[in-house]
Amino acid sequence: NLKGKVLKSNFKFDFIYDKNYLKIDNLFFRDKDLSFKSIGLIELKPFFKASLNSEIKEIDLIKLKKLEYGDFVKLKPFIKRLNIQNNIVFKSKKFSRNLIDNLNLKVKTAYGRLNIEKNIFILDTKIYCKNDINLLDEFPILYFNCELNSPNKKRLLKKVKIDHKKKDDRLELNFLGNLNILNKKINFDSVSLKKNYKATEEDLKYFKKTFENIFLAEEFFKLFQLSKLRKFIIEIS
C-alpha cells in the first residue's frame, strides 16, 4: 500500500510489483478539482504500456477552461512516449445540475495519436462519438463522427432550457467533420437527420459560421458552457 501527496493532491493505491509489470488496485486520487478511482496493469518491459479502468468521482470543468496551450506544448515530449488504454466512467450525482447524466470513454493513446470513443447519456438520449487527433501536430485537428439518438426531442431540449412544442418527437442526428483547435475553425462534412434531411453545402457553411461565432470566438474550452449550446441550437433550429 502506498500513500502520497504531490502539492495539494492526495493519492493512495495498492500494488504488486514485478520487474516486467506493475499491477495497481484501489488507486484513489483527490484534489480540489478532480477525484477518481482506478485499477489496471502497467507493463514496464519490453515497452511501457498501461491498461486502466477509471471512474471519475468529481471534476471541476471551470479549471479545465483555464488550461492554456502553452502548458500543453510543454507536455509533448512526454505525450510522444505514452502508450495507454483507459476506460473511463463518469456518473452524475443524483439531483445535480450537470447536463450529462452518464459518460463512458474508451481512450487510446500511442505515439502521440489519441483515439476516443464516447457514449454520452442525457436523460434517455444517447450520443455516440468517435474522435481522433494527432497531439504532436503543430496544429492538431480533432476529427469527429457522431450520432445522436433521442426518443423524445422535447424532453432533451427542456434539459437545456429550450421550449419545444411538439410532443414525443424523435430525433436521430448524424454529424461528421473536424475541428482545428488552435485556429478555432470547424468544418462539417455532413449533417443529417434520419430519413428526412441532409444538409446542403450552404447549410454546412451556415452551421460552420454559426458554431465558430458562438463557441470559438473566445477561449476554446468555453464551448462547455450550457448557454452557448442553447444559443447554437436556437440559431440553427
Q: How should these model regions be labeled?
A:
Residues 1-123, 127-237:
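Membrane-proximal interfacial segments on either side of biological membranes
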